[in-house]
């Protein structure tokens, strides 16, 4: 049976949601972040050399990286569900947003988190300098980039109910975490379509089932 090596408050929540949407049986092995470093525990390195989550094992197969995991699950268990037909405009949108989630949306969000943490982890004497540098990077670079990406997402959802058309797809599953992360840090602002989309996915029975099985998740 497929096993999800699940880290609390992490991208792996999306994998649980996808499996619930598809009705695929799975096991969960829970891992907890270190309370100080917020990093994954070393036990995960026994599953994959990088020791990060998400990672799944399915028989003798181990798959890491959320996008690769989503592709694997859709191909192995989807039976044509949650993916638009090949050659359609919806399929191109699906491919774009599936990769946008980690390729474009997440990096500035992670950098925002890191620059916010740096002043807490350096000597008090130079902490004001750390705050100044972090604030400048956030104001001049990261903040505008995140806003531009959220505006793009809002514009896309003005075209249709979901990111790849009128039906939920795995692209929406991938996009859930960056939108949730952005919302938790600075809110979605005056972006009604994006806000409505987030509320709608959170209300789905499969999403709620994944929350119950996954445990602590600060973004929903």
Identify the residue ranges that each predicted region occupies:
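Terminal-tail/helix-coil boundary detector
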Residues: 207-220
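GST-like domain detector, emphasizing the conserved glutathione-binding G-site
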Residues: 1-132
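GST-like fold's C-terminal all-alpha helical module
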Residues: 101-200
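Residue-level signal for nonpolar/aromatic packing positions in well-ordered secondary structure
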Residues: 19, 56, 69, 153, ...
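Residue-level recognition of oxygen-bearing side chains
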Residues: 68, 193, 206
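Conserved beta-strand edge residues that scaffold enzyme active sites
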Residues: 33-34, 171, 215-216
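Residues at helix-coil transition
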Residues: 74-78, 158, 202-203
